A protein has these predicted regions:
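Alpha-helical segment that forms one wall of the substrate-binding/catalytic cleft
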Residues: 93-141, 149-157
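Export/targeting segments at the very N-terminus of extracytoplasmic proteins
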Residues: 6-68, 104-108, 118-135, 193-197
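Substrate-binding/active-site groove segments that recognize
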Residues: 74-94, 114, 148
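Catalytic and substrate-binding regions of cell-wall glycan-acting enzymes that process beta-1,4-linked
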Residues: 133-193
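Generic alpha-helical structural context detector
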Residues: 58, 62, 85, 145-150
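Short, solvent-exposed loop/turn elements at domain surfaces
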Residues: 67-72, 89-91, 157
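Sec-dependent N-terminal signal peptides
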Residues: 1-2
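Solvent-exposed, acidic/flexible segments
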Residues: 46-54, 73-81, 99-107, 137-141, ...
Length: 198
């Protein structure tokens, strides 16, 4: 009896006719997309990458350049990961034109810079990992992403000041926002290397 009473409460009393909703076979549905070139959506073709290293790389690349290897921003930063020319020189790349035309070189450069930053910030990673600073849980991947944005020195200042020294790039993106957005990824397999080169 109770089941019958409850199930009758979910049945429509009157069915409505929605003929306006149906599409005639002769009608054409048009959709407008931002771009017709599939190459504009390279980063979106990846499968689910989760919190693995590939997810870290692709998420950071998408934030930096929408994942485009040929991107040069208004400040002259280059490639998928938006490297400055000086930073490229520190990891052994002298020819920026070759760098821009070689996706494999850009990927190797990203890993080399991670190794170098991990070595530079190895003490901070040990000391601050797991702590909450300026409302952000500090993780190794967050520290490395923030170092990619503003350099190891800016990350060190932020951490040592307990978040009081707010560092931002020229576009206004903060170190702490990168720490938050890119925290919790698997970067522990990247070895720290003071002399990392491509």
């Amino acid at each position: 009896m109770i089941v019958g009473l409850i199930s009758s409460a979910f049945k429509p009393i009157d069915s409505e006719n929605h003929e306006w909703f149906y599409v005639d076979a002769n009608e054409e549905l048009l959709y407008q997309f931002p771009s017709e070139k599939s190459s504009d959506y390279v980063a979106l073709s990846l499968p689910f990458t989760g919190k693995f290293f590939i997810g870290f790389k692709e998420a950071l690349a998408f934030k930096e350049s929408q994942g485009k290897y040929n991107k040069v921003n208004t400040l002259g930063y280059l490639g998928k990961y938006q490297f400055g020319k000086t930073t490229l020189e520190t990891i052994g790349i002298k020819d920026s034109l070759q760098f821009m035309s070689n996706p494999k070189l850009q990927e190797k450069a990203f890993v080399a810079l991670l190794k170098k930053n991990k070595w530079e910030l190895r003490e901070e990673i040990k000391e601050y990992r797991g702590k909450i600073i300026d409302g952000v849980r500090i993780t190794e991947s967050g520290i490395l992403a923030a170092a990619h944005l503003g350099g190891a020195g800016s990350v060190r200042k932020f951490l040592k000041s307990n978040g009081l020294k707010k560092c931002k790039d020229n576009y206004g993106t903060s170190i702490s926002s990168y720490m938050k957005q890119f925290g919790g990824y698997e970067t522990h397999n990247i070895p720290a290397d003071k002399n990392a080169k491509v």
